[in-house]
From Swiss-Prot:
Enzyme nomenclature, EC number: 1.-.-.-
CDD domains: CYP57A1-like (cd11060)
Record protein name field: Cytochrome P450 monooxygenase ATEG_03631
Cellular localization per UniProt: Membrane
Disruption phenotype: Abolishes the production of azasperpyranone A.
UniProt source species: Aspergillus terreus (strain NIH 2624 / FGSC A1156)
Glycosylation sites: 309
Keywords carried by this UniProt record: Glycoprotein, Heme, Iron, Membrane, Metal-binding, Monooxygenase, Oxidoreductase, Transmembrane, Transmembrane helix
Expression triggers: Expression is induced by the azasperpyranone cluster A-specific transcription factor ATEG_03638 which is itself regulated by the azasperpyranone transcriptional regulator ATEG_07667.
Gene3D superfamilies (alphabetical): Cytochrome P450 (1.10.630.10)
Length: 492
């Protein structure tokens, strides 16, 4: 007690001590943080602060910078004081496996819906495994491939509208078009059909309805930065002013989906029915059925499910489609090979003008093109972060203490030369065909296009259903090799 009084008296008589003590403690804390992962190579500044990785994302070149850093430093690279990026494909199962899953980091907090500032868990961003399980279990069957095949007529309907709009707006008038924009609008209208039994109106209007696409992009630009320094969320993206600008705090995609949910609830109240006479039950009908059957489902679940479909289901598919057509346009030999395969299948009576899922699954070169599209330009450009369990873990031969943040970037893993070859930076669908079964299995298992393990994106089958149908259909109908000028019909 006397010693404590002496220290207090000394500090009172020496004001500099009051300043020096917290500075000293801060420096000690900083040193401990740095030394904790000093055995992991990486940029010097990244050992002291998260500002470098924040700046990489700010540059819009984080995916390329991450790849370059791994080629310089090896399979483990320190991205921050407590963050290690892993680039070895063999570690995918270790970090993202189905057994003993590692918890998601605070990276995902920035991706949560926050109506009125309060975060609402979603299937993708939920950190608590119990919450994730409670949200996923009631609706997981709706995302199975067998169930999604019952949705194929919805995709067909939107594809017909897509083709009609291309022909009336551009082919007949020989006008140039922004094909990437139209592929994105197609993806939005498909997910609208699947989720709400109606297109969202992008294709018919030829416009970004309510600026949803632009607003989602702006939101992603901000949240991607905040994921690197999660404490910024309340200061920047979720402060009262931003919540007011968003009309109560919901992100653009979430607000759009929640409005559609309220429309359906109002229809249910006024008609007093659970069946709105749709030919096929859409996602929202299935979500509401699940909610009605299980009173334990939290009240926010319906909005979380619907908004996930709109926000994630449209953007990732749009990116994927743009990638494939860009690569086909810039690699004429690939386009020629794929068109040849499609024409031969059609001549044999095995491919309709409106391609079906069953038919396209028998086309190996199309399969290779789509796999290569997901490999060379995965939609998600940042590492999928996880927290090392309390006991620590050995990754790539080095021990990482419990609580360390680790993550694998699809861009880094997909450019692993040992697995994908010296030409891994190049577009080459043949890599999936000119290899043995074991090599192909390893390459497929390392694909992180839609994540990995038990937290793999539930909507990946939706994306594949669209791609395996729309790519061959458009290539059969139109000469896309002339897209740099204008789109023309292949039939005259």
């Amino acid at each position: 007690m006397a010693l404590l009084e002496d220290i207090i008296n000394f500090a009172t008589l020496n004001p500099m001590v009051v300043v020096a003590i917290p500075v000293f403690l801060f420096v000690i804390s900083l040193l401990r943080s740095y030394l904790r992962l000093a055995h992991i190579p990486g940029p010097f500044a990244a050992g002291w602060t998260n500002l470098p990785r924040f700046s990489w994302v700010l540059s819009f070149k984080a995916h390329d910078i991450h790849t370059a850093l791994h080629r310089k430093y090896g399979p483990l690279v320190r991205f921050g004081p407590n963050m290690v990026s892993v680039g070895d494909p063999k570690e995918v199962g270790h970090i993202y496996g189905f057994t003993d899953p590692w918890m998601k980091s605070d990276f995902y907090h920035a991706l949560l819906m926050k109506p009125r500032g309060k975060p609402i868990p979603g299937i993708f961003a939920a950190q608590d495994e119990n919450i994730h399980r409670a949200l996923k279990k009631p609706i997981s069957s709706a995302y199975s491939m067998s169930t999604l095949l019952s949705f194929e007529p919805y995709v067909d309907s939107t594809m017909r509208v897509f083709c009609e709009q291309l022909e009336s707006r551009f082919i007949e008038n020989k006008k140039p078009l922004d094909f990437g924009k139209w592929l994105q609008m197609f993806a939005f209208d498909v997910i609208g059909e699947l989720t709400f039994s109606r297109r969202l109106g992008f294709l018919e209007s030829g416009e970004d309805i309510n600026h949803v696409m632009a607003n989602i992009w702006e939101t992603f630009k901000k949240t991607s930065l905040v994921t690197q320094m999660p404490w910024l969320d309340k200061l920047w993206t979720n402060n009262p002013i931003q919540r007011w600008r968003r009309g109560g705090g919901a992100s653009p995609g979430a607000a759009f989906a929640m409005a559609r949910v309220e429309e359906r609830r109002e229809l249910q109240r006024t008609t007093n029915k659970n069946d709105w006479h749709f030919n096929t039950r859409d996602f929202l009908s299935r979500f509401m059925e699940a909610e009605a059957k299980d009173p334990s489902i939290p009240p926010y679940a319906l909005a979380a499910w619907a908004s996930s479909n709109i926000t994630a289901g449209s953007d990732t598919t749009g990116i994927f489609l743009r990638t494939i057509f860009y690569q086909l346009l810039t690699h004429p030999e690939t386009l020629r090979k794929l068109r040849e395969e499609l024409d031969q299948a059609a001549a044999a009576g095995n491919l309709d003008d409106l391609a079906s899922w069953k038919q396209t699954r028998e086309l190996p070169y199309l399969d290779a093109v789509i796999k290569e599209g997901g490999r060379i330009h995965p939609p998600f450009g940042l590492p999928y972060e996880r927290v090392v369990p309390a006991q620590g873990a050995t990754i790539c031969g080095k021990f990482l203490p419990g609580g360390t943040l680790v993550g694998m970037s699809a861009w880094v893993v997909h450019r692993n030369k040992e697995l994908y070859g010296e030409d891994c930076d190049e577009w080459n669908p043949d890599r999936w065909l000119k290899c043995d079964t074991e090599k192909r299995r390893k390459m497929e298992n390392a694909l992180l296009t839609f994540g990995a393990g038990h937290r793999t994106c539930m909507g990946k089958h939706i994306a594949y259903l669209e791609m395996y149908k729309v790519v061959p259909t458009l290539l059969r109908k139109y000469d896309v090799s002339r897209l740099l000028c204008f789109l023309v019909s292949r039939t005259g």
